A protein has these predicted regions:
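Structural signature for solvent-exposed beta-strand/loop edge elements and short helix-capping sites
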Residues: 1-175
């Protein structure tokens, strides 16, 4: 395999071509892209090191920020250091091996500069059952207050059976 390192970015793959003059690279075959505490895996990567933009095909990801998130997509676009766009995506904050809930979206934008996620053509699924569908909704990525739906809550009891709660938070004042 081949390894590329620059600052906090490391790329590993079977094949890698790098144009030093323009800062562009292409990698294929078992691509692993690491940036800070984020990990991305895919089949093919085109990336511009000068502005942190590029495309990763058939990605899986694990992002360890204030809240760990993981998922996959048909395609992932790097839109700068802290901005991602995923097409045909699924996303969860559940621990690996536990997919109790997940968000599926035709397009999922994650902007860690603004601490906001935006899902288009979205479905919120609980144990493979869609519990909410929305053409568009936004959600916070960090611990910032924002009016909107909160993470789903799940419970199981012998008295009531399975329960799903979808709380709504109304941020009346920014403080």
């Amino acid at each position: 395999g081949v390894e590329f390192r620059q600052g906090e970015t490391s790329i590993y793959s079977e094949y890698l071509k790098y144009n030093r003059e323009f800062g562009r690279l292409e990698a294929e075959g078992g691509v692993r892209f690491e940036q800070g505490s984020d990990r991305f895996f895919g089949s093919r990567l085109r990336y511009d090191t000068t502005d942190d933009t590029g495309v990763l095909e058939a990605p899986a990801f694990l992002m360890r920020r204030k809240q760990t998130a993981r998922g996959g997509a048909e395609r992932l676009e790097f839109l700068g250091r802290n901005r991602l766009r995923l097409s045909g995506a699924h996303f969860t904050t559940c621990e690996p091996g536990n997919d109790d809930w997940r968000l599926e979206a035709r397009q999922l934008d994650l902007d860690y500069e603004e601490e906001e996620g935006v899902a288009r053509g979205a479905r919120l699924r609980f144990f493979d059952t869609t519990i909410l569908g929305a053409p568009y909704f936004s959600f916070p990525l960090e611990n910032r207050r924002k009016s909107g739906l909160l993470a789903p809550q799940f419970a199981q009891s012998t008295l009531r059976g399975a329960e799903v709660g979808l709380p709504f938070y109304w941020n009346i004042a920014p403080e």
